């Protein structure tokens, strides 16, 4: 119950005394209250609300009478209400895909409404009202996006999607076991296996693509950087296209490193006119019972009805290749826009994903989004047997399919062609005068292992409307997840200047050898580098021993607390028992911190560990940059904090690696990552 609202008919019907709460939001409503409300909106998503005050608000709130303070004077609300009135919205208990233009536009209507809200009573009123009116999955996408971008909810933590919509992350077999346990009233914990069998070589790395934390990272990144976003939603997102390049480049490189750890050949990039060798059966179902489509091995890529023809994809690709070769793209007015510069990667990324800022959408098309839909429908390109979207058409599930990595290896190759057209960095550009790296080493073991992880299937089960949260039966899934033991980077840096210097410390690694044991040349290795950390540090004159713990990495984030934990913490804060302190979980766009390093193997996989120390004053866009990047590696609310390109200084070709070896502010060493088949069972 809402303690602060005990004296009111509705928690938002009048003024309240929030004494004892931290007024950390623009409208003075405490974060604990907002976290409580969001928790209950998402609890039992597919059922009516289970919280009395919110249910009362649902019955009394009229969106049309709460538009006075909206900047658009209620235009967005009126438009969405018209869709409700004419019953044009997607029906409930149906699938939703952001790649479906009609469904996406419905979601954006709600996003616009929620972002127009200037106070919490209006925001939660609209969120409650439209919860019962809209398709559940459309609603979740819109709600998560609005919470991520609204200044009203800057301290609210989004619950993990694998607990809100468990069907997307949990095998049908485990869901069926959970249903049976629910029917007989028996709590249960059910072990879930990865997709496929030992007969499929790709099964060896299913732990990576099917990692629920990695999938959470991916969808959270797309929520933070939606391809449809423009400034009418509140602000412009900087370097959107470049961020698109980098997050996918890193996923491809990390997938390649995992393949080497498991003695698998490198990814073959997609070719539209060749066969797609890897099939995929996701073994998952939608909440309504429909199965995700599967795909056989060795299929010839066909035209897909109502999506695109293969030749359309080739035309799009060739136009992008021509732009890269010429060094410019064409905008809608026919003007040439130069891309042979540090900002070109941003324009190219906008074009490939077909973002709103794409200079000429009609000409360059939508290679990325259309590619997902084309490959997703290859199991049934003419819709003879089903019309449900595949795993490739949901951010929650797309990383599971090997075709995702083939598509993005193909796209990554286009980005590399562009980057290789740029002039290599000169010694003058790379040098940080007076700064030298004396030594790099790792303190602690570079060793990975698997550990069981348990997450709730509560939202997958149906309950009576009067069921209280505390009365829910404990039913959960258990899945092994890759982790690593604690370690620290230690870098000895000499500052030969007479004053403190702000330094950007950039740490990367790439496989020293390919799967055949051949040493990667520097120029090839640097393109396959995975980013391990980037942070800012003041270097005092003389010798500096810089220590950075693995869990401090700006590339990664910790696991978001479970929905149950968020509920308990919010209720305790509202009751005055404890303070709500969830700051470290607010930004969830980073990789899971347990996946910082690749798996390795029993013999040890060699990696070249490289550290570049660059001029922090020249790099930063913010005087407080060293204090603000801990949890916002990809930037925050549209602002990216590092002026340098993603991957700098390894993002451009290196004709002669001796240049890097001779620069004192660049250092390298060889390390080994081990995995001894250790599996920690926590839930026996």
Swiss-Prot record:
Residues bearing carbohydrate: 100, 193, 230, 626
Name under which the protein is recorded: Pseudohemocyanin-1
Keywords: Glycoprotein, Signal
Other noteworthy facts: Does not bind copper.
UniProt signal peptide: 1-23
One GO MF term attached to the UniProt entry: oxidoreductase activity
Tissue specificity remark: Strongly expressed in ovaries. Also expressed in heart. Not detected in hepatopancreas, gills, connective tissue or muscle.
Source taxon at top rank: Eukaryota
Keyword presence, Glycoprotein: yes
Similarity field: Belongs to the tyrosinase family. Hemocyanin subfamily.
Annotated spans, Disordered: 7-32
Subunit structure: Hexamer.
UniProt key word Phosphoprotein: no
Known role: Does not function as a hemocyanin.
Designated gene of the protein: phc-1
């Amino acid at each position: 119950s809402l303690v602060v609202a005990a004296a009111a008919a509705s928690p938002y019907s009048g003024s309240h005394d929030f004494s004892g709460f931290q007024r950390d939001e623009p409208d003075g409503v405490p974060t604990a209250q907002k976290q409580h409300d969001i928790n209950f909106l998402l609890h039992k998503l597919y059922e009516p609300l289970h919280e009395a005050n919110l249910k009362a608000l649902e019955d009394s709130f009229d969106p049309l009478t709460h538009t006075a303070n909206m900047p658009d004077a209620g235009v967005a609300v009126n438009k969405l209400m018209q869709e409700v009135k004419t019953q044009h919205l997607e029906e409930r208990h149906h699938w939703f895909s952001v790649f479906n233009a009609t469904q996406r536009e419905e979601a954006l209507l709600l996003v616009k409404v929620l972002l127009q809200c200037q106070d919490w009573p209006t925001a939660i009123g609209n969120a409650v009202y439209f919860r019962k009116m809209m398709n559940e999955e459309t609603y979740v996408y819109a709600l998560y996006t609005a919470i991520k971008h609204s200044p009203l909810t800057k301290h609210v933590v989004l619950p993990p999607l694998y607990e809100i919509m468990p069907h997307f992350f949990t095998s049908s077999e485990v869901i069926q076991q959970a249903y049976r346990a629910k029917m007989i009233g028996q709590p249960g914990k059910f072990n879930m296996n990865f997709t496929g069998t030992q007969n499929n070589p790709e099964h060896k790395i299913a732990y990576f693509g099917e990692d629920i934390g990695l999938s959470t990272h991916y969808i959270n990144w797309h929520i933070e950087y939606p391809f449809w976003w423009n400034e009418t939603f509140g602000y412009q997102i900087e370097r959107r296209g470049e961020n698109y390049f980098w997050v996918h480049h890193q996923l491809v490189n990390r997938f390649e490193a995992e393949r080497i750890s498991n003695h698998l050949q490198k990814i073959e990039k997609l070719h539209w006119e060749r066969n797609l060798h890897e099939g995929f059966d996701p073994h998952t179902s939608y909440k309504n019972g429909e199965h995700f489509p599967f795909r056989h091995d060795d299929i010839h890529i066909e035209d897909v009805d109502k999506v695109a023809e293969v030749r359309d994809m080739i035309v799009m690709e060739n136009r992008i290749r021509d732009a890269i070769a010429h060094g410019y793209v064409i905008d809608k007015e026919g003007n040439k826009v130069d891309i042979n510069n540090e900002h070109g990667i941003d324009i190219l990324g906008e074009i490939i994903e077909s973002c709103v800022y794409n200079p000429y959408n009609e000409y360059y098309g939508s290679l990325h989004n259309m590619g997902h839909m084309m490959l997703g429908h290859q199991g049934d390109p003419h819709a003879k047997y089903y019309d449900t979207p595949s795993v490739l058409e949901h951010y929650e599930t797309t990383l599971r399919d090997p075709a995702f990595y083939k598509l993005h290896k193909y796209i990554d190759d286009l980005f590399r062609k562009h980057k290789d057209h740029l002039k290599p960095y000169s010694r003058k550009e790379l040098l940080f005068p007076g700064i030298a790296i004396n030594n790099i080493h790792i303190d602690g073991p570079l060793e990975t292992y698997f550990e069981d992880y348990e997450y709730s299937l509560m939202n997958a089960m149906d309950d009576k409307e009067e069921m209280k949260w505390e009365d829910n039966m404990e039913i959960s899934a258990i899945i092994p997840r890759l982790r690593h033991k604690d370690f620290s980077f230690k870098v000895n840096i000499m500052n030969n200047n007479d004053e403190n210097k702000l330094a950007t410390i950039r740490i990367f690694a790439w496989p020293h050898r390919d799967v055949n044991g051949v040493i990667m040349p520097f120029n090839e290795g640097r393109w396959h580098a995975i980013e391990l950390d980037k942070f800012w540090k003041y270097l005092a004159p003389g010798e500096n021993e810089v220590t950075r713990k693995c869990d401090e990495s700006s590339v990664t984030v910790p696991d978001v607390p479970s929905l149950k934990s968020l509920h308990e913490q919010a209720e305790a804060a509202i009751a005055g028992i404890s303070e709500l302190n969830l700051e470290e979980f607010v930004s969830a766009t980073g990789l899971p911190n347990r996946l910082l390093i690749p798996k390795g193997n029993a013999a040890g996989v060699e990696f070249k560990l490289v550290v570049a120390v660059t001029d922090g004053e020249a790099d930063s866009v913010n005087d407080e940059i060293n204090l603000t990047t801990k949890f916002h590696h990809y930037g925050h609310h549209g602002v990216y904090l590092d002026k340098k390109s993603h991957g700098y200084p390894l993002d451009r070709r290196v004709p002669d690696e001796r240049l890097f070896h001779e620069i004192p502010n660049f250092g390298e060493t060889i390390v080994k990552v081990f995995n001894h088949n250790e599996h920690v069972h926590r839930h026996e």
